Regions:
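A conserved active-site cap/scaffold subdomain adjacent to cofactor or substrate pockets
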Residues: 222-294, 298
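N-terminal Rossmann-like NAD(P)+-binding subdomain of aldehyde/semialdehyde dehydrogenases
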Residues: 1-114
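Conserved NAD(P)+-binding/catalytic subdomain of aldehyde/semialdehyde dehydrogenases
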Residues: 170-257
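Short internal beta-strands
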Residues: 144-153, 258-265, 271, 342
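Conserved small-residue-rich beta-alpha loop and adjacent elements
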Residues: 99-164
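C-terminal core of ALDH-fold dehydrogenases
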Residues: 304, 312-423
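Short acidic-hydrophobic, aromatic-tinged amphipathic segments that line or gate anion-handling sites
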Residues: 1-4, 173-178, 298-303
Length: 423
């Protein structure tokens, strides 16, 4: 039986009509006016009107010199892990060709998109990991032109660490611009910036809405909502660590969602007490406490099977398993963005360092999609060719199949081949 010790507060669905209209106006102005429209919104929202929005070679060369050696080493380490895992993913996306019947050859080719745009948020804080995840991954996939943009810091250009991360990740063009106007510039193109084929990266609700409205003009990765974590824990789990991981996600956003699925009331109650204790001294408690109060859930279940059901219903962005037998959950849980198995891993590792991508589905989207990977930046295309003898045999069946659907011109395209290749 499933029992709630703590439930999230039910909130009315937010009316985003005003957000949609604001985004629509920004997109239209930049589509129609180009750089003039971009400059208008950059001045309005970011107090930023540089001679050129593209970051200069001098700025790029200077970025590394502004950072402590340890920070550079750490960035390089994190990027190496992300690159290594992406390369392993890429090895498993392969071309192939097969002869399905004598004389009929079918094949698959993996072709990278020509150009992608990476949006790295961070006007308030440097979001280094977002640069790692959204720049390195397309480069490993073989994208020849990767455009990266990030908002200015209080009218002073990019964070040096963010800029270095973009450069080290392999970005081909870097622009200092943020928000909806940055996405519009990448999608439609402006003077000196050719449009991209797809865009990836997270942001606020305006950025998410812009991606939704631009989908079709460009491809997108996914529409991200507030971050989520669901932790499955049994009595072997350490309440101190479980609580720390809950708060690690809660500090993201007052709307962040957290759930503990406990296999006993004991671990549930101990963890709740530990969350309250850790919140007292947490530097980010102003955000984390609100997220936990409003959106935190604690659910006690009787069995691993019930835990799997709750988890799959949630379809969390991040799934942590802190149980004696985490392999059971790896084998049976189906809906999640990324799984962190055992006490020895934590969401923070995946967010920043360990190598898996942190751009993950939220809002139950894990029911039908995974997170960002090299696979998002390639097209799986197919081809076919046949001998004359095989074409003759296929044409006879295909002509009838077309006629069953009253697609008569289709049928004729088969018949002319049947007639031509008749023995």
């Amino acid at each position: 039986m499933i029992k709630y010790l703590k439930k999230a507060i039910e909130k009315p669905q937010e009316d985003i009509t005003a957000v949609q209209e604001t985004v629509r106006e920004i997109l239209a102005k930049i589509k129609n006016e180009g750089e003039a429209g971009l400059r208008f919104y950059s001045e309005k929202f970011d107090n930023w009107s540089p001679k050129s929005f593209r970051v200069s070679e001098d700025e790029i060369r200077a970025a590394k010199s502004k950072l402590p050696a340890t920070e550079v080493e750490d960035i390089d380490f994190c990027q190496a892990q992300i690159r290594n895992f992406a390369q392993e993913q890429m090895k498993r996306l392969v071309d192939f060709e097969v002869e399905t019947v004598p004389g009929v050859h079918l094949g698959q080719k993996i072709i990278p998109v020509s150009c992608s745009g990476s949006y790295i948020p961070g006007g308030r804080y440097p979001m280094l990991a977002s640069a790692h995840m959204t720049v390195i991954t397309p480069k490993v996939a073989g994208v020849s032109r990767v455009v990266a943009c990030s908002p200015p810091v209080k009218g002073q250009g990019l964070w040096p660490a963010t800029l270095y991360s973009m450069v080290a990740g392999g970005a081909d063009e870097i622009y200092c611009m943020g928000g909806v106007h940055a996405l519009a510039a990448m999608a439609y193109g402006i003077e000196g910036l050719q449009p991209v084929d797809m865009m990836v990266g997270a942001g606020n609700k305006y950025v998410a809405e812009a991606k939704r409205q631009l989908f079709g003009t460009v491809g997108i990765d996914l529409l991200a909502g507030p971050t989520e974590i669901l932790i499955i824990a049994d009595d072997t789990a350490d309440p101190f660590i479980v609580a720390a991981d809950i708060l690690g996600q809660a500090e993201h956003d007052p709307n962040a969602r957290q759930a503990l699925v406990a296999l006993s009331a004991s671990i549930a109650e101990k963890t709740m007490k530990e969350v309250d204790r850790q919140l007292v001294d947490l530097p980010t408690k102003d955000i984390a406490a609100v997220a936990w109060r409003d959106n935190g859930e604690v659910i006690v279940v009787d069995s691993p099977e019930e835990a799997v059901k709750v988890s799959d219903d949630w379809a969390p962005e991040h799934l942590e398993v802190q149980t004696e037998d985490w392999k059971y959950y790896l084998d049976n849980c189906k809906n999640y963005g990324s799984a962190f198995l055992g006490e020895e891993t934590t969401v923070a590792y995946g967010d920043k360092t360990i190598g898996t991508n942190h751009v993950l589905p939220t809002m139950k989207a894990a029911r039908y999609t995974g997170g960002l990977s090299v696979g998002k930046f390639v097209k799986t295309v197919t081809y076919q060719y046949a001998t004359k003898e095989a074409s003759y045999k296929i044409a006879d069946v295909c002509e009838r199949a077309c006629n069953y659907e009253n697609m008569l011109a289709h049928g004729i395209s088969c018949k002319v081949r049947k007639d031509k290749y008749a023995k």
